[in-house]
Amino acid sequence: MASPSSLCLLAALALISWQAMASDPSPLQDFCVADMHSPVRVNGFACLNPMEVNADHFFKAAKLDTPRKTNKVGSNVTLINVMQIPGLNTLGISIARIDYAPLGQNPPHTHPRATEILTVLEGTLYVGFVTSNPNNTLFSKVLNKGDVFVFPQGLIHFQFNPNPHQPAVAIAALSSQNPGAITIANAVFGSKPPISDEVLAKAFQVEKGTIDWLQAQFWENNHY
């Protein structure tokens, strides 16, 4: 029969192994440039042959200093992730420029795979995130040029330009090569196929006609 100390050691090893498997692995080589054409399906991308790698795999002429035209909610997101720079594969980071029209917003959304840190380059932004159930606490702040704010991974967050006359610009860094995004309104009212209006009417405590009207709108994909 195993001794108590042996059982404790086995339990500790099992816990350590479980924690190791539950987090993203660190790179095991200098780089693993994504091979976009590989038939191998892995969590991320297979590595391109290092002998075929060149500097362009780590470069993108993105012109992130150039203003972008905003959409009907008054924002435009220019994302640079592993799909634009294959060299980001396994490195756990991406970047985005967000342009905001006067009174424009980046609507409430989440990044299921990344924490975000946002820096205001120009203008003013009202930003915030909401904690999970049951408290649903709002943490919000008005940011000015040079200010920085963090949005924890997976939590609903937003940015809004309160200035009716001046645009705003921000840069966001995200802790994933592919952070993903779920824009709340798009997901709930613009899903394909649509969620039953009976389900949504009860969830939001409104008439079915209100839900039908919302689902009939054009839910533009503006996310990163």
Swiss-Prot record:
GO cellular-component terms in the record? apoplast
**SMART domains for the chain:** Cupin_1
The UniProt entry, under Gene3D superfamilies, shows:
Jelly Rolls
Keywords assigned by UniProt, alphabetized: Apoplast, Disulfide bond, Glycoprotein, Manganese, Metal-binding, Secreted, Signal
**Which family is it part of?**
Belongs to the germin family.
Misc. remarks from the entry: Member of the 12 germin-like protein gene cluster located on chromosome 8 in the major-effect quantitative trait loci (QTL) for fungal blast resistance. Partial suppression of the 12 germin-like protein genes increases susceptibility to the fungal pathogens causing rice blast and sheath blight diseases.
Pfam families in alphabetical order: Cupin_1
**Subcellular locations according to the entry:** Secreted, Extracellular space, Apoplast
Q: Domain named Cupin type-1: which ranges?
A: 62-212
Q: Which SUPFAM superfamilies match?
A: RmlC-like cupins
InterPro entries for the chain: Cupin_1, Germin, Germin_Mn-BS, RmlC-like_jellyroll, RmlC_Cupin_sf
Task performed by this protein: Plays a role in broad-spectrum disease resistance. Probably has no oxalate oxidase activity even if the active site is conserved.
Give disulfide pairs as residue numbers.
32-47
This chain belongs to the protein called: Germin-like protein 8-5
